[in-house]
């Protein structure tokens, strides 16, 4: 893995917009921190409450906000895909953070993105022994996992076959956090 911090910085900043998922029941943070101007709070599960904790919500435009209890921060990713990445002329970088989990990037790191042709920035992988499949078995209901496997087998059989190999690995990238070039994130979604 290459650390973004070690790459040469560029001289021009590309457009970047990273949405930080916030939920109305989030616990208060013990310490506050200043967010970069390119990080925008986005309330997830906004369809489930009248309480507002952010100006922007996943309940605007094309959304699955009401399904937040099942999909957590993925309702933010869906909203981003349908309401930002589909816009004509959209470019630059987009991403997703959590209210208490962010990638440690400074302004110089943002300058490194375009200069070095970076497609995506991810967190460091998390180790789970003995493998990813056993980790998921502890946290995902069997019926939900089986439904996902059926859908994957039907809609993306090549990914279904890859999952068998990937699932036996001891590490994965947690929390659906990333920053990616517009087209890369759009393809991912």
Language-model segment annotations:
Residues 1-189:
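ER/Golgi luminal nucleotide-sugar-dependent glycosyltransferases, focusing on the catalytic module
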């Amino acid at each position: 893995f290459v650390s973004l911090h070690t790459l040469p910085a560029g001289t021009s900043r590309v457009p970047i917009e990273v949405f930080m998922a916030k939920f109305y029941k989030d616990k208060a943070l013990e310490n506050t921190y200043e967010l970069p101007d390119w990080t925008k709070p986005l309330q997830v599960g906004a369809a489930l409450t009248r309480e507002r904790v952010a100006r922007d919500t996943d309940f605007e435009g094309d959304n699955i906000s009401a399904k937040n209890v099942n999909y957590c921060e993925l309702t933010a990713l869906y909203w981003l895909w349908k309401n930002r990445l589909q816009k004509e002329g959209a470019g630059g970088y987009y991403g997703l953070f959590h209210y208490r989990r962010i990638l440690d990037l400074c302004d110089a790191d943002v300058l490194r993105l375009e200069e070095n042709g970076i497609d995506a920035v991810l967190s460091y992988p998390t180790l789970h022994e003995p493998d990813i499949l056993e980790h998921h078995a502890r946290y995902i209901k069997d019926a939900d996992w089986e439904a996902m496997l059926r859908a994957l087998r039907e809609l993306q059989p090549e990914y279904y076959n890859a999952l068998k190999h990937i699932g036996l690995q001891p590490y994965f990238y947690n929390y659906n956090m990333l920053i990616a070039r517009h087209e890369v994130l759009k393809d991912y979604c």
